[in-house]
Amino acid sequence: MGEEYDSVEDISGALLLHVEGYGDVRLSDVADVEVIDNSADSYTRLNGEKASILKIYKNATSSAGEVSDNCLTAFEQMESRYDGLHMVVLSNQGNYITIVIQSILTSMVVGAALAIIVLAIFLKDVKPTLVVGISIPLSVLFAVVLMYFTGLDLNVMTLAGLSLGIGMLVDNSVVVIENIYRLRSRGVPAARAAVQGTRQVGMSVVASTLTSVCVFLPVVFSASLVRSLMMPMSLCIGYCLMASLIVALTVVPAAASTVLKKAEPKRLVWFEKVQEKYAHSLEWCLQHRALPLIAAVVLLVFSGWQVLNMGVELLPSITSNEAQITLSTADGLTKEESYAIAGQVAEAALNVENVEEVGITTDTSMAGLDISQLGLPTAITDILNSANAYGRYKINVMMSKSLSSREVEKTRQAMEDAVSQIENCTAEVKLYGMTDDLTSQLATGLSVKVYGKDPETLTTVSEKVMEIVNDTEGFANADNGLGSGDATIILKVDRDKVRAYGLTVAQVYQQIAAKLTTTATAQTPVTVNGTTMDVQITDNLDPVTKENMMELTFETTEMSADGTVTNGTCTLNDIASWTTGTAPDAITSENQTEFVTVTADTLKGYNTMVQSRVLQKKLDEYAASGEMPEGCSTTLGGETEGTDYMVNEMVQWMALALPFVYLVMVAQFQSLLSPFIVLFTVPLAFTGGLLGLLVTGQQLTMISLMGFIVLMGTVVNNGIVFVDYANQLRIGGMERRAALVATGKTRMRPILMTTLTTVLAMLQLVFSGDMASQLMSGMAIVIICGLSYATLMTLYIVPVLYDILFKKPPLNVDVGSDDDLDDIPDDAAEFIAAQKSAGTAQPEA
């Protein structure tokens, strides 16, 4: 074997050995060699015509998109080379990735454009807008270079990180250019405004960036699943932020000192009116401090409770124009009858409107494994296939690419209605999404493990659990996997007789197993005239049957009463008996305890986690009622187990990130109290994010939880800038509440600008409706609503907390001097002078 032959006759004439006095013994002398057409062993059709289905897998180091493009090119070349060859792609994961990447790139461009528009509106000047606009491509280029040197590829998760970074990376540049522009409007020369404006907010910008970056540090402590999903995105966001910090502290002031030399800052009359109204509302909040705090806490509790009742899921479902029909024909049908029904189902699906391609093939998987990939001898593979494949089919459906998500669902429902009319079969029609492969590994859907001592008890208890599951609203089609059992030959070994013959049960088992596995050896294929074929060796002289298996001979050792040892033989018939029956094939063992898994489908419109809480109460009642046999127990698994695992990992991530954020702010403020005030904006952001999910009907997922982690680092930025500037004004001699109102009016513009640039950059991911939106919309909604709500609250709650906690006046007063270029222009002195001229100066509280 392993050689190449020109024909079957060459194989038949292969020399086996030479016998003296007889001559050469060739293969044809002891065996018949023939080529058998086994195409009927599987059923494969494309749009009703005979076909072959190929599955192509990429290796671990290759890009799915690149492999997909190369395969499509190769298909076109083969179609042009061979007449009559027609190749149709029924499923292409590389296509999903390409679509998502293109969508995210579009979001990046749109987000950058919207950010520049926001700057133009607030600054009312093209020059500072262009300065910030330059920082966007520079920061992205810097981030991409860092990605290259750290070995990160451009994929869905890294581009999602860049897309998030687009809205965030202009924040630092906006704060710097706005402060420079503000000083320039006071008549400060361009060079001095660039230096002093950058120094005035420099430490705040550094602290803000570090808080945004440090929230991603705990990802290295996460379990492999969370780390593998979130590490690329986290690194990309971190690279963007660090790049934006460097650009904001170097390129932006350098460009501003040149561009703004002849600039004449323009007044924003409409915004000045907004500032005055905000100042009056802030003064009212400072006089009624309890009301805004109570409102913030009530909203946080309400939103959290409502979202948890909505449920949690692992990953958002991403629908595409592909569907898969899992078909099972009734038991007792012949192969031809089963094939005919499968053809009817495929034809019914093809006749549905908007369906373009339908491919069907026999399903050779068993218990989640592909039998053909197990490396078993061909004869055993054929036996398993014959018991498994005839009657089980997978049908891949390709719908029109122009369909919307709603139209795709309508087409799926139409296919389900069409195939349900066909008798003697059961079919399930599911849409195929990009996250399906991952979620299938995480065991989605309902799963209940039933533990017990023996198969009979497990069967009884699992049937009761199935009844409870089916009675629970939101669940249907409960199954314990036992069914009616497969037809099985049950061999009962008499242990006493085995010991009497000097044997052990293990010896009997090993010899039976050896007999069953030596009937086929087909590990090496042969090549005949350029065609590679598998080899099937069948021993027709000694076939395996129930009868001749019972005549299997064992060597025995018997000892008489006087100690004499006698060697002999016995047959399997002497020590065992056989019967036919059924045996369950789904009872498995865990920690030496047998269990059965009960699974069920979650109906559309219901959440597995929410309904699992109801089911858990019913299972607890069943266990407490005394009906459950002693030694039996139940645990929820599947999506419930996977979601609990994911939520715990993400909560631990948040818990670890919070101290990092606090420590960075302690270093910035050199105070333990100031960071606490800023840290209060984190639950405010959570309130906004939770309310956003509640209003839009989105569920908590791993992706949306990532949005909350991003918020932890970003929402404190505005608080840092606010508190830092308020401290500067109080050190300059201003009264506490006057400093807070002045800070709010002064920092309102950069706070709103940074918020709007981030929010507008995220909007494309929410409203585009494409595959990237389906994947990232949850996180985008959390960031948009959380940041918007937290920004509004920062302008009110942070001043209120500052007013409550900072009772003591500042110890050091530094009014500064305008003679030294390195001295910061004294904003506090200017505000105090304005108050005196208006007659509103107040003593320090």
Q: Positions of the model-derived regions?
A:
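Extracytoplasmic/periplasmic
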Residues: 313-396, 417, 455-488, 836
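Transmembrane helices with small-residue packing motifs
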Residues: 3-5, 18, 148-153, 220-228, ...
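Helix-loop junctions and hydrophobic alpha-helical segments within the transmembrane domains
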Residues: 97, 101, 177, 182-210, ...
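Transmembrane alpha-helices and their membrane-interface boundaries in multi-pass membrane transporters
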Residues: 166-178, 202-221, 228-266, 395, ...
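Solvent-exposed, membrane-proximal periplasmic/extracellular interface segments of envelope transport
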Residues: 1-4, 340-441, 497-510, 514-517
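Signature of alpha-helical transmembrane segments and their immediate interfacial
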Residues: 201, 267-316, 448, 825-835, ...
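Extracytoplasmic/periplasmic membrane-proximal domains and adjacent transmembrane bundles
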Residues: 1-113, 120, 177, 428, ...
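Hydrophobic transmembrane alpha-helices and their membrane-interface caps
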Residues: 113-182, 660-747, 752-768, 785, ...
